[in-house]
């Protein structure tokens, strides 16, 4: 498979910034590069938007993924809220018929368990450019709330960062029937039933 990993924001666009100035753009880059390495170790092809703290437009991201004919588009973000107690993982997809809808459910289930954060579930939106303009099945992962002080403190721990990366990597690998990164992890893989082959998972 060829994966497109989109690390949100970058450069002049820091994305969400915590009370202690932890940047979303830096956080997802660190996590994303670990995911890239995990996938490549399993002989998966990976294309990225960026591998440094650089800015790229939303149109650049989707155009590059489409030009590369990637099989799946995975966009990584950290969430933020004025409610500083908000916490949990959620994944956005274009609609419920998406081929990656069940993958999104699995990511929520597994990441919630692996880093002990609430499962906020799969959400639907046709407004996200990276979901709307990509030709391949796409998801946008909101890993957790960088605005939550507990989450922000955890992000300083390299083991926690690695746990996030491994959890997401393993959900992706399980989706395409590849071995998981760490045998100590157990993963939920929901396949489901479909009426036609175009909406079936494979």
Task: Annotate each predicted stretch with a short phrase.
Residues 1-21:
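Short glycine-rich His-centered loop
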Residues 3, 22-182:
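Active-site-proximal helix/loop segments of hydrolytic enzymes
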Residues 180-202:
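Solvent-exposed beta-strand motifs enriched in subsets of small alpha/beta binding domains
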Residues 17, 54, 188-189:
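Generic anion/oxyanion-binding catalytic loop in active/binding sites
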Residues 6-9, 13, 73, 86, ...:
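Short glycine/serine/threonine-biased micro-segments
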Residues 10-13, 17, 81, 90, ...:
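Gly/Ser/Thr-rich beta-alpha loop segments that engage phosphate groups in nucleotides
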């Amino acid at each position: 498979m060829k994966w497109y990993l989109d690390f949100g924001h970058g450069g002049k666009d820091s994305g969400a910034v915590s009370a202690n100035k932890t940047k979303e753009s830096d956080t997802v880059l660190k996590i994303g590069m670990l995911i890239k390495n995990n996938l490549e170790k399993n002989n998966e092809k990976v294309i990225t938007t960026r591998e440094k703290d650089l800015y790229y437009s939303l149109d650049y991201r989707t155009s590059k993924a489409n030009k590369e004919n990637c099989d799946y588009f995975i966009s990584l973000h950290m969430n933020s809220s004025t409610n500083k107690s908000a916490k949990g993982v959620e994944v956005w997809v274009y609609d419920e018929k998406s081929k990656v809808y069940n993958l999104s459910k699995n990511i929520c289930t597994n990441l919630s368990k692996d880093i002990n954060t609430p499962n906020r579930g799969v959400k639907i939106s046709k407004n996200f450019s990276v979901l709307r303009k990509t030709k391949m099945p796409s998801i946008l992962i909101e890993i957790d709330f960088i605005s939550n002080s507990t989450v922000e403190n955890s992000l300083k721990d390299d083991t926690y960062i690695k746990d996030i990366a491994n959890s997401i990597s393993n959900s992706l690998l399980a989706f395409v029937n590849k071995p998981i990164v760490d045998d100590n992890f157990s993963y939920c893989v929901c396949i489901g039933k479909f009426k036609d082959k175009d909406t079936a998972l494979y």
